[in-house]
Regions:
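The AdoMet/dcAdoMet-binding core of the Class I SAM-like
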Residues: 2-5, 39-46, 53-56, 113-278, ...
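SAM/dcSAM-binding transferase cores
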Residues: 2-97, 101, 109-115, 130-133, ...
């Protein structure tokens, strides 16, 4: 999950949507005509800094999208979620042009993004895609499959990768197949992609997973089980020897339905629970305009940086140096 749309199911979005991410945060505001995405990954920030002397700067996720460039393709309630699918016009002057976004829950959590003509997204899904070179050969689990953004990137960039994805809501998988090309991806990768509907925390595979990617949110917050050390011990036991877990742990930009569940507090509780299991072998990558906007966590011994970079596509190498030991 990496965005939040702050509007109730009854709210009509007439003029604007604003977002910040980890979750990006979208809010409807009257008498405005822009959609803004104030969050950007640091790789993108660094590129923009290098262009700061230019008088004609390219559009960034900070810039708005005219509302006429956004179309609602689907909107309905399932047993588990309030589901919306948005499409951003290819004519929009914005980095998200040509994308489709999956929003879930009353706060409007955006769980997936997909572009028609490119693989990478300039979101944390790209960071997830840096894990294959630092894990043993073997299957990767995606816990919180959404519409398949993570799986799509992994399958496109790593021809030998096998992905097993778990999603609780069958309606989300139906939407993924209809609006996010999941049916086509499944047909083309019958021996490489396996999608299951059910509780992701029960995920298991004989022989274990080489890597586990965790992206589990409900009602706008990391699920409570992730604040329990027992959950991480169970996931650790699901790994092959040398395997790793990478987690979207959210941050201050997460807006939960329950206002008591502050995103930054929940993130720290999750990291502390992980620390109880993984000890010093826990690293954090901070994203966003502010240091605590959103974060990812990585377990295991820290890889040798240059070796890791050299095994990645050039467009992903910039993320490697952003990891820091967790010191909470």
């Amino acid at each position: 999950m990496w965005m939040v749309l702050s509007s109730s199911p009854q709210t009509q979005i007439h003029n604007t949507i604003t977002t910040q991410t980890c979750c990006h945060h979208l809010q409807s505001k009257p008498k405005t005509t822009r959609i803004t995405f104030p969050f950007k990954l640091k790789c993108q920030q660094q590129e923009q800094h290098q262009q700061s002397n230019s008088s004609l700067k390219p559009k960034t996720q900070d810039d708005g999208i005219p509302i006429e460039d956004v179309k609602t393709l689907a909107k309905f309630k399932s047993r588990h979620n309030y589901i919306r699918v948005l499409e951003v016009s290819r004519k929009a002057d914005h980095p998200f042009r040509g994308s489709r976004l999956l929003l879930l829950d009353n706060p409007g959590n955006i769980h997936s993004i997909s572009f028609l003509f490119k693989t990478l997204t300039n979101t944390y899904f790209d960071v997830f895609a840096t894990i294959p070179p630092i894990i043993p050969n073997g299957p990767i689990a995606v816990l919180g499959f959404g519409a398949g953004s993570t799986a799509r990137i992994l399958l496109n960039l790593y021809p030998d990768t096998v992905v097993h994805g778990w999603e609780l809501d069958p309606s989300v998988i139906e939407v993924a197949r209809e609006y996010f090309n999941l049916s086509k991806i499944e047909r083309e990768n019958k021996q490489r992609l396996f999608v299951y509907v059910g509780n992701a925390l029960t995920a298991s595979l004989e022989g274990g997973f080489s890597g586990i990617l965790v992206d589990l949110f409900s009602e706008g917050s990391l699920i409570p089980e992730l604040q329990e050390a027992a959950t991480w011990e169970k996931l650790r036991k699901s790994l092959k020897k040398g395997g790793r877990i990478m987690v979207n742990v959210g941050g201050s930009c997460v807006e939960a339905e329950d206002k008591v569940r502050d995103g930054n507090v929940v993130m720290e509780e999750t990291l502390k629970a992980m620390r109880m299991v993984f000890g010093e072998k826990l690293f954090v990558l901070r994203l966003g305009n502010r240091g605590d906007d959103s974060s990812l966590a990585l377990t295991g011994d820290f890889p040798e940086i240059e070796t890791w970079k050299n095994k990645l596509p050039s467009s992903l190498r910039c993320y490697v140096g952003l990891w820091k030991p967790y010191s909470g």
